[in-house]
Amino acid sequence: MDKTKALDAALTQIERAFGKGSIMRLGKSGAALEVETISTGSLGLDIALGIGGLPRGRVVEIFGPESSGKTTLALHTVAEAQKKGGVCAFIDAEHALDPLYARKLGVNLDDLLISQPDAGEQALEIADTLVRSGAIDVLVVDSVAALVPRAELEGEMGDSQPGMQARLMSQALRKLTASISRSNCMVIFINQIRMKIGVMYGSPETTTGGNALKFYASVRLDIRRIGAIKERDEVVGNQTRVKVVKNKLAPPFKQVEFDIMYGEGISKAGELIDLGVKAGVVDKSGSWFSHDSQRIGQGRENVKGFLKGHPDVAGRIEAAIRQNAGLIAERILGSSEDSEDGEDAAEA
């Protein structure tokens, strides 16, 4: 009996036992080989991810220190999904979502499903039910650290419950992964940072909830606040750096910087200036900026104001940047060469 007949017999047996479509040849499956994506709301980050945004049907982890922009980035992704007609859900385990801020970022609150569960099991059960429905495009869990196991809630303050949250996350992700892929729903887990005690070499930082999420996530984003943006003496925003520490769909370790303005979110105009200058679309001479031989302003903040008031110019600059996305990724968003790369690679 030759191999072809043996294989056909095995395939027939598998389909009889588990149903048609349980096994197929990848090229003939009819499934799109290109992964569908949803924009992050940041042009630079979309380019750095290598596929034009965050992937659908996958697990994504966004982690970083406090007040670094984790929830802001997740809400921008929700807003972008809603613009395309997607249905989004937000599981607010921290009980800290600000609806007014979400609206300012472009989130349609009337269509956003929100849950504020009491226990971690309840939160993940709700997530599982929503994903299995097949009707959700983006599901955000904010945050993993706030998913408290019921046994810990019912216990006394100060009781030691080692590893319970890690076991909860591990079991939940085992159940969720297949459903997420089938329903083509993107699940974004927001996570916090903790310090490991007694680490002599490498980074002492780690994320909460054990190691399961590091393995199951297709994309992991490390977001950090690297400076303040001031107008005279008043702080009006943060300079933010995002590093792609894990990416199963494109080369990882790209990093990008952008501005997060208070009450506004990611500054698109600021990104257009920075990416435009580095890509050669916007010319900078001293403090003057010009595009297509036309001066558009003196000083970065003035140019941001000009682009907000002239969406046609901003649109042309964005189109030119997107057209050269491949070159830009190589030229300006090169792999970072920080000493922690080895640590990140090991954790990823």
From Swiss-Prot:
Keywords on record: ATP-binding, Cytoplasm, DNA damage, DNA recombination, DNA repair, DNA-binding, Nucleotide-binding, SOS response
Job description of the protein: Can catalyze the hydrolysis of ATP in the presence of single-stranded DNA, the ATP-dependent uptake of single-stranded DNA by duplex DNA, and the ATP-dependent hybridization of homologous single-stranded DNAs. It interacts with LexA causing its activation and leading to its autocatalytic cleavage.
GO CC field: cytosol
Family recorded in the similarity comment: Belongs to the RecA family.
Coiled coil: none
Organism: Blastochloris viridis
CDD domains membership: RecA
Presence of keyword Cell inner membrane: no
GO molecular function, one term: ATP hydrolysis activity
Residues reported in the UniProt entry to bind ATP: G64, P65, E66, S67, S68, G69, K70, T71
InterPro entries on file: AAA+_ATPase (IPR003593), DNA_recomb/repair_RecA (IPR013765), DNA_recomb/repair_RecA_CS (IPR020584), P-loop_NTPase (IPR027417), RecA-like_C (IPR049261), RecA-like_N (IPR049428), RecA_ATP-bd (IPR020588), RecA_C_sf (IPR023400)
GO BP: DNA recombination; DNA repair; SOS response
Protein name: Protein RecA
Subcellular location as annotated: Cytoplasm
Organism phylogeny: Bacteria, Pseudomonadati, Pseudomonadota, Alphaproteobacteria, Hyphomicrobiales
SUPFAM superfamilies: P-loop containing nucleoside triphosphate hydrolases, RecA protein, C-terminal domain
Pfam family, one: RecA_C
PANTHER family: MITOCHONDRIAL DNA REPAIR PROTEIN RECA HOMOLOG-RELATED, RECA
Family matches, as HAMAP family: RecA
